[in-house]
Swiss-Prot record:
Effect of C363A: Increases binding affinity for 8 nt target RNA by comparison with 9 nt target. Complements phenotype of RNAi-mediated knockdown of puf-8 in vivo
Lineage: Eukaryota, Metazoa, Ecdysozoa, Nematoda, Chromadorea
UniProt tissue specificity: Expressed specifically in the germline (at protein level).
Name of encoding gene: fbf-2
Substitution effect: Q448G: Slightly reduces binding to lst-1
Species: Caenorhabditis elegans
Stated name of the protein: Fem-3 mRNA-binding factor 2
Subunit field text: Interacts (via C-terminus) with gld-3 isoform A in an RNA-independent manner. Interacts with dlc-1, and is required for the localization of fbf-2 to P granules. Interacts (via RNA-binding domain) with lst-1, probably displaces bound auto-inhibitory C-terminal tail and alters its RNA-binding affinity.
Each Pumilio repeat, start to end: 187-225, 226-264, 271-307, 308-332, 345-384, 400-436, 438-473, 484-521
Length: 632
């Protein structure tokens, strides 16, 4: 707390009478002698705060000798429990007398939040206490004080959210300041005060309920004129927290009323929104009005409204905005592709793609576009020309994505786009392109990335068997072991905080294939033997490193996966060979007699790179800092 503020708010206040609205009542007995009046002043220690420790204790005696009976308080109410233990107070037993209180000391770190608030967090003349106290205390025979601390009805710290009707016109309120129960919509429309009702919570709720009822033609005309008839009023209501709901309702009524003014109203609505398209898209409340208009307007006018979207950097701002991105998603959902094809071309631009995909809201826009272009491939209502347009747009966007798939796969948000492409069977062509162009020969490094490891998992789960075999071979035999430690790619990934999830995925795939839960045939060729060979290699490595693995939750999951397979689906050659390594007790936690066999190395948090067996690249050992995974 600011020292200057502390000095201002914590000065002792001397009052001979009860201050107004303090919640402290004083009931004096008949007057005593002048000397008796100076003997028993009362000090309220519930109000003292740390500044009290800097005061001169002699001030208390001076107040007691020269002032009449008084109550000394300070704000904010910060209770103090340890003051009476100070040696200084032992000399003044009759001067300093604590008032009972029901809170603990504010010096304790675990005290309530209200004890740590500043003076600005409280009302001017309100005392806040945690419980009501109504006690009488007698100090000697000269004076009786009756103190009553009551919880205030309203303070800045415990603010009541009861609505104030200051916005509504006085003629609409009753004697209690509330809206009249028999108020009608016609009165509001005839008065010309509809704007005041629309920006008030209760007033807007009244209008919302009223317009849903049966309306006369004249009432509709008045609504249209006062809500969507004037541009300034329309924009003011559209950007208001309450008024935007009324605008949406009136737009729905307007578009459902097919009278002589139907076309004129829609054209006017389109012009109003088009003139402020960017600002309304970026507004938290006006963006809902745009979405409602796109949903309900005639398609021809809605398409013209889409053309009002900017084609420059402002479109990036709309795509990555928390509110405006929903406008783009609504355009993609309800407007034909030929009217928003420019959005696809804009997003597919390399620099724009990087900015939009790397944003938490922009990545959702791109994924929505991909989903729409993919889903329309099954739409039989589309003409051949529309299908050709869809395929070309999808190809342009996918080409831009695959050219930067490695950069996108390692991004916090863009990796979801790559995951979606890899896991979607309708995008199998682009999935294979991503695996071959981006993931192959980089599996070890990407598996050690926090976000790219999810992409690698999806690739193992959804890759065609031919590519899956290449990926498995790369992990098992695609890298030269480290010259100093002898670690190969599987060993590094098995004990890495992110790579271990990829190994678990590989193990699950092999177990499912061997147990018959996964298809092993593709293109007339059965890969069952390959799955058995991969499982043997994984089983051998888990057996070898069982003690280290049993120390981590990820390792225990690998051990448990093999143990479950042993109990439900016996492995042919492993079981027939009499090897008992699938028994659960064989994977028990390492004991103290294991000695050097138990290494001290834990889960790796850095990225260890190995040299591929192919001569395409040679990478030295490199560690990069990453955040630890909560599972380990």
């Amino acid at each position: 707390m600011d020292q200057s503020k502390m000095r201002r708010t914590n000065q002792f206040r001397k009052t001979s009478q009860k201050p107004p609205s303090t919640g402290i009542d004083s009931y004096p007995t008949p007057a005593q002698s002048p000397m008796a009046q100076h003997e028993t002043p009362m000090w309220d220690f519930n109000s003292l705060n740390p500044y009290f420790s800097m005061l001169n204790m002699n001030d208390g005696i001076n107040y007691a000798r020269h002032q009449q009976n008084h109550i000394v308080t300070s704000r904010p109410p910060t209770p103090l429990t340890d003051l009476m233990s100070l040696r200084s107070f032992q000399s003044f037993p009759n001067v300093f007398m604590p008032v009972s209180r029901s809170r603990t000391s504010s010096f304790i770190q675990s005290d309530t939040d209200s004890s740590r608030l500043e003076s600005d967090d409280f009302s001017q003349n309100v005392r806040c206490f945690s419980a009501d106290i109504d006690r009488s205390k007698s100090y000697g025979s000269s004076k009786h004080y009756h103190l009553k601390y009551s919880r205030p009805a309203l303070s800045r710290n415990s603010r009541s959210f009861t609505r104030s009707n200051n916005v509504l016109p006085t003629w609409s309120l009753d004697s209690n300041g509330e809206m009249r129960s028999r108020l009608s919509l016609s009165e509001v429309l005839d008065s010309g005060d509809l704007m005041k009702f629309a920006v008030d919570k209760t007033g807007c709720q009244f209008l919302e309920k009223a317009v849903k009822g049966s309306l006369t033609s004249y009432q509709k005309f008045q609504l249209f004129e006062q809500v969507i008839g004037r541009k300034d009023d329309f924009l003011k209501l559209s950007t208001n927290i309450f008024g935007n709901y009324l605008v949406q309702s009136v737009i729905g009524i307007s578009l459902a009323t097919n009278d002589d003014g139907y076309t004129k109203r829609q054209e006017k609505l389109k012009n109003f929104i088009s003139s402020q398209m960017t600002d309304m898209c970026l507004d938290k409340f006006a963006c809902r009005v745009i979405q409602s208009s796109l949903q309900n307007m005639d398609l021809s006018l809605a398409c013209k409204l889409v053309q009002a979207l900017p084609r420059d950097a402002r479109l990036i701002a709309i795509c990555v905005d928390q509110n405006a991105n929903h406008v783009i998603q609504k355009v993609v959902a309800v407007i034909p592709l030929k009217n928003w094809e420019f959005i696809v071309d804009f997003v597919a631009t390399p620099e724009h793609l990087r900015q939009i995909c790397s944003d938490k809201y922009g990545c959702r826009v791109v994924q929505t576009i991909i989903e729409k272009l993919t889903a329309d491939s099954m739409n039989v209502d589309l003409t051949s020309a529309a299908q050709n347009l869809r395929e070309r747009a999808l190809q342009r966007l996918m080409t831009s994505v695959t050219n930067r798939c490695q950069e996108l796969a390692t991004n916090e948000y863009a990796n979801y786009i790559i995951q979606h492409i890899v896991s979607n069977d309708d995008l199998a062509v682009y999935r294979e392109c991503i695996i071959e162009k981006c993931l192959m020969r980089n599996l070890l490094s990407l598996s050690q990335e926090k976000f790219a490891s999810h992409v690698v998992e999806k690739a193992f789960l959804h890759a065609p068997l031919e590519l899956l075999a290449e990926m498995m071979d790369e992990i098992f035999d695609g890298y030269i072991p480290h010259p100093d430690t002898g670690k190969d790619a599987l060993d590094i990934m098995m004990f890495h905080q992110f790579g271990n999830y990829v190994v678990q995925c590989m193990l699950t795939i092999c177990c499912d294939a061997v147990s018959g839960r996964r298809q092993t045939k593709e293109g007339g060729y059965d890969h069952a033997i390959s799955f058995q060979d991969w499982l043997k290699k994984l089983h051998s490595r888990v057996t070898k490193e069982r003690h280290r693995l049993s120390r981590f939750s990820s390792g225990k999951k690998m051990i448990e996966t093999l143990a479950n397979l042993r109990s439900t689906h016996p492995i042919y050659e492993l079981q027939s060979s009499g090897h008992d390594s699938f028994k659960t007790d064989y994977f028990s936690t390492a004991s103290e007699h294991d000695g050097p066999e138990l290494e001290k190395n834990g889960i790796e948090e850095g990225s260890l790179m190995l040299e591929p067996r192919s001569n395409k690249s040679s990478v030295s050992v490199k560690f990069s800092s990453s955040g630890s995974h909560g599972d380990d």
